[in-house]
Curated annotation (Swiss-Prot):
TM stretches of this protein: none
Chief location of this protein within or outside the cell: plastid
Gene designation per UniProt: PPA6
Lineage: Eukaryota, Viridiplantae, Streptophyta, Embryophyta, Tracheophyta
Organism expressing this protein natively: Arabidopsis thaliana (Mouse-ear cress)
Cofactor(s) the protein needs: Mg(2+)
pH-dependence annotation: Optimum pH is 7.5. Activity is extremely low below pH 6.5. Activity decreases slightly at more basic pHs, activity at pH 9.0 was only 10% less than that found at pH 7.5.
Residues that bind diphosphate: R140
Protein's name in the database: Soluble inorganic pyrophosphatase 6, chloroplastic
UniProt EC number: 3.6.1.1
GO CC aspect terms: chloroplast; chloroplast envelope; chloroplast stroma; plasma membrane; plastid; thylakoid
Amino acid sequence: MAATRVLTAATAVTQTTSCFLAKQAFTLPAKKSCGGFGGLCFSRRALVLKSKRPFSCSAIYNPQVKVQEEGPAESLDYRVFFLDGSGKKVSPWHDIPLTLGDGVFNFIVEIPKESKAKMEVATDEDFTPIKQDTKKGKLRYYPYNINWNYGLLPQTWEDPSHANSEVEGCFGDNDPVDVVEIGETQRKIGDILKIKPLAALAMIDEGELDWKIVAISLDDPKAHLVNDVEDVEKHFPGTLTAIRDWFRDYKIPDGKPANRFGLGDKPANKDYALKIIQETNESWAKLVKRSVDAGDLSLY
């Protein structure tokens, strides 16, 4: 029998049953800040792109989202589906809204901190449930626990046809943008958190660009203390280095080379992270509008 739990998810900007451009423009005031941890500096003036508004498609409005687990945990059949208030399956990737305004975003937990089962949204399955990743028919695990909550930003996509000129011309990894949430609480698979981005790391995995947005949940006791990359080093000393080193080295025990990082091997600041989020939201919008080839990706 499927197990079901109810989450209180953040609501969308406006109610909708079809694709729309949100009324609130995703813009930032002109300001310049630099990360104290050797962080890259990014001016908000440069964040004005062709499209200033976050794109959202069929974003759910009902704050009650049910998470339904099907199949035994840590099995090939295990899936975590998301249901709306009527019990209809929805996609955590496509139907949960990205932005809530005022620099706050929805974050969906795939892997709870202090666990090592490699969970991910199944981007090629209907309704994109969360499942455990496999290789050659076997379940995948990290060689050691991940020390932070890990998951995705909904309604984002790293376009594999787009070469990033700022990161060695690397192409996107064809997945939603990853988030590393540094709060103290261990979350559950499928939890939806309100987070604020703090920094970004440009990981290069076998030649593909795989952004890691460092963020914190708004309900964490230290959330009010951190607003940018330099605050992370002050209030979470050593965390940015630990995140970089963990993702650099986790494949080594399997005999693979270490991952690399662009942008001078340094974390970029909050403004740069927001730029990445906006750009990948625009890429996702092109995907769901079928302006680019979706390949095997599920669009519902």
